[in-house]
């Protein structure tokens, strides 16, 4: 019985790590692409810098929620270990 419980705890810990890792990878890639395209837009048309920057910050905040959701899921999984 002890082996089964430690196996379950280990798999839960791996699942928590995967949840945080994939969430961070996905939002990191998305943020990099969005920032790159925003800088390209600002370089082509400097007069729209304020508008593009505002939309970029809002979009980055939405993308960051993916990482936060992964962290919340990881905490929920780790609480199941107790």
Swiss-Prot record:
Annotated GO MF terms: lipid binding; proton-transporting ATP synthase activity, rotational mechanism
Main location: membrane
TM segment ranges: 5-25, 55-75
Site description Reversibly protonated during proton transport, residues in chain: 64
Membrane topology: Multi-pass membrane protein
GO cellular component terms, A-Z: plasma membrane; proton-transporting ATP synthase complex; proton-transporting two-sector ATPase complex, proton-transporting domain
Protein location: Cell membrane
Described purpose of this protein according to its UniProt entry: F(1)F(0) ATP synthase produces ATP from ADP in the presence of a proton or sodium gradient. F-type ATPases consist of two structural domains, F(1) containing the extramembraneous catalytic core and F(0) containing the membrane proton channel, linked together by a central stalk and a peripheral stalk. During catalysis, ATP synthesis in the catalytic domain of F(1) is coupled via a rotary mechanism of the central stalk subunits to proton translocation. Key component of the F(0) channel; it plays a direct role in translocation across the membrane. A homomeric c-ring of between 10-14 subunits forms the central stalk rotor element with the F(1) delta and epsilon subunits.
Annotated family: Belongs to the ATPase C chain family.
NCBIfam families: ATP_synt_c (TIGR01260)
Oligomer status and interactors: F-type ATPases have 2 components, F(1) - the catalytic core - and F(0) - the membrane proton channel. F(1) has five subunits: alpha(3), beta(3), gamma(1), delta(1), epsilon(1). F(0) has three main subunits: a(1), b(2) and c(10-14). The alpha and beta chains form an alternating ring which encloses part of the gamma chain. F(1) is attached to F(0) by a central stalk formed by the gamma and epsilon chains, while a peripheral stalk is formed by the delta and b chains.
Protein name: ATP synthase subunit c
């Amino acid at each position: 019985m002890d082996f089964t419980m430690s196996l379950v705890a280990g798999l839960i810990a791996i699942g928590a790590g995967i949840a945080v890792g994939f969430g961070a990878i996905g939002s990191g890639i998305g943020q990099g692409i969005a920032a790159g395209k925003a800088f390209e837009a600002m370089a082509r048309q400097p007069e729209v810098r304020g508008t593009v920057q505002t939309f970029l910050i809002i979009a980055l905040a939405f993308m960051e929620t993916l990482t936060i959701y992964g962290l919340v899921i990881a905490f929920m999984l780790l609480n199941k270990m107790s």
